Structures are given as structure tokens and as C-alpha cells.
């Protein structure tokens, strides 16, 4: 059996037997999500929870001051940031900002792959957020929220993590980028959907993780997966399908013209979004 097939066989067997170790949410994200679900939580208490993590606090202030909050007056404290963002969006935004903590490894090859994967993910997130911002401005449709958009884009390829964990356990055999690419292409969507269910995330997250590369999956209405696909296409993450993705986006009125993706406005919005994760 080839090394490539061996890795795939081990992964498929563990998926089938429900023995694949799935990543858990970072502790601070779990705390914030639990607090957000408390009907008695207030903005001050939420600020105290987020304040336990200096890195998350700094990024929360950064997003509160970003173009996506649409305010010109800067906030300087976590309490001000939480007040501006609001309890409804805090749950998903804080989870999104904590996700980078999952992309770590002690294995040099796997670590390099994770760093590359995180950078690619941030690019896709930034592009997806920019596309949605332009869509809302053009259509005035506000059924979808930017906080869910951000988190669905950040978790769209989360299925790579257990694959890389398995590779790390067998580093002398499996830590080969070619083998990893094949396993990821075949199994990441299926595993990603399992992670989203394990974390208790909604079906929109499951569908994006499972189907973002599968262009035969076309929801009846425009939804988050449309923006993730365009974001991925602009980032060069959908090999050989960029034209198909963009044509589908035009058909579904996600964008009205490909030219918008080359505009200064798009570049500015994507750049502002990317800075949130810098």
C-alpha cells in the first residue's frame, strides 16, 4: 500500500469508526460562547470575559475600529469595543478571532503547512467579507450577517486540522506535502462538516465546510457559501474552477461584474478585513 493510500485509509477508517480526534474550540472561544448564551449576560460582564485574553481583546478593539463597524470615532477599551460590536455578534466574532490558536504544530513540515493554511484562510476570509460588503451595499439585502460570514469563511477548510494531526503522529512517513494535499482534497470537506456538528454550529457552517468546493451544490437562495466561493476563487484556492465560480456568482447576483473584484474599493475592503487578523 502506498503511503498516500495508507494515510487516506487510516483517516477513512477513523471517520467511519468515529475515532478521529477532532479539534476543540480554543478555551477563550468556549468561554465567550457560553457567556453569550447566558440570557442574563450584559455588555460589562462580556467585556470581563474577553478581557481574560489579551490577544483576543486587542483584536476585538481592532475590529470595533474597522471599516466593517462603520464608525469614525475610535474605541480604546474592550468595554467600548463590546458595546460597539454588540452581544449578538460577539459570539461569532470572538470565536473567529480565536481560531488562529488551532493552527499550531511541533512538527516542522506540518507547522509550515499550518502557517500557510492560516494565511490562505485569512485571505479568503478578507475577500469573502469584502464581497459581502459590496453585495449588501448594492442590493440593500441584509438577511445575512457579517459575523456569521466571518466565521463560516474561517472554518470553511477546518477539516484539514485532523488530517494534519494524523500526519504529525506519523511524521516520518506522512509529513509529505504531496500526500497531505491528496488526503486534504479527498477528505477535508467530510471531516470539516463533522467538526462543525461536534462544535454545535448551525447547518450553514456544516454546508460551507462540506460543500464549498462542490459546485454541484447550489442553494436556492444566496447564502454564505456563495461569498466563501468567490473569496476562495479570488485567492486562487479553487484550482481550475475560478471561472466557473465567478460565472455562477454573476448568475446568482452575488456580484454584478467581475470587474468589481479588481477595483480599489474591493481592495480597500479586503485589506481592512485582513488587518483585523494581522
Could you describe each region identified by the protein language model?
Residues 170-171, 277:
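Alpha-helix C-terminal capping segments
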Residues 3-14, 253, 259-278:
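Terminal helices and disordered tails flanking the catalytic cores of nucleotide-processing hydrolases
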Residues 243-257:
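Short helix/strand-capping connector loops at secondary-structure junctions
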Residues 1-155, 162-169, 175-177, 183, ...:
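Conserved alpha-helical "signature site"
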Amino acid at each position: 500500500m502506498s503511503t498516500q493510500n495508507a494515510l487516506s485509509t487510516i483517516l477513512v477508517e477513523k471517520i467511519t469508526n468515529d475515532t478521529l480526534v477532532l479539534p476543540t474550540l480554543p478555551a477563550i472561544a468556549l468561554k465567550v460562547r457560553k457567556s453569550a448564551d447566558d440570557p442574563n449576560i450584559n455588555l460589562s460582564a462580556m467585556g470581563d470575559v474577553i478581557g481574560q485574553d489579551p490577544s483576543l481583546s486587542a483584536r476585538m478593539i481592532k475590529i470595533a475600529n474597522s471599516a466593517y463597524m462603520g464608525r469614525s470615532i475610535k474605541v480604546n477599551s474592550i468595554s467600548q469595543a463590546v458595546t460597539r460590536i454588540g452581544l449578538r455578534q460577539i459570539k461569532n466574532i470572538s470565536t473567529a478571532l480565536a481560531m488562529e490558536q488551532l493552527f499550531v504544530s511541533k512538527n516542522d513540515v506540518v507547522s509550515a503547512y499550518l502557517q500557510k493554511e492560516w494565511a490562505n484562510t485569512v485571505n479568503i476570509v478578507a475577500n469573502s467579507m469584502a464581497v459581502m460588503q459590496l453585495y449588501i451595499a448594492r442590493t440593500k439585502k441584509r438577511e445575512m450577517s457579517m459575523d456569521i460570514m466571518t466565521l463560516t469563511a474561517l472554518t470553511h477548510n477546518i477539516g484539514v486540522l485532523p488530517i494534519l494531526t494524523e500526519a504529525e503522529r506519523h511524521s516520518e512517513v506522512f509529513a509529505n506535502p504531496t500526500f497531505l494535499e491528496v488526503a486534504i482534497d479527498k477528505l477535508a470537506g467530510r471531516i470539516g462538516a463533522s467538526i462543525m456538528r461536534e462544535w454545535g454550529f448551525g447547518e450553514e457552517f456544516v454546508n460551507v465546510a462540506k460543500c464549498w468546493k462542490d459546485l454541484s451544490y447550489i442553494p436556492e437562495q444566496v447564502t454564505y457559501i456563495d461569498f466563501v466561493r468567490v473569496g476562495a476563487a479570488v485567492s486562487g484556492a479553487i484550482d481550475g474552477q475560478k471561472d466557473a465560480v465567478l460565472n455562477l456568482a454573476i448568475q446568482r447576483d452575488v456580484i454584478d461584474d467581475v470587474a468589481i473584484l479588481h477595483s480599489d474599493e474591493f481592495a480597500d475592503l479586503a485589506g481592512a478585513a485582513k488587518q483585523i487578523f494581522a
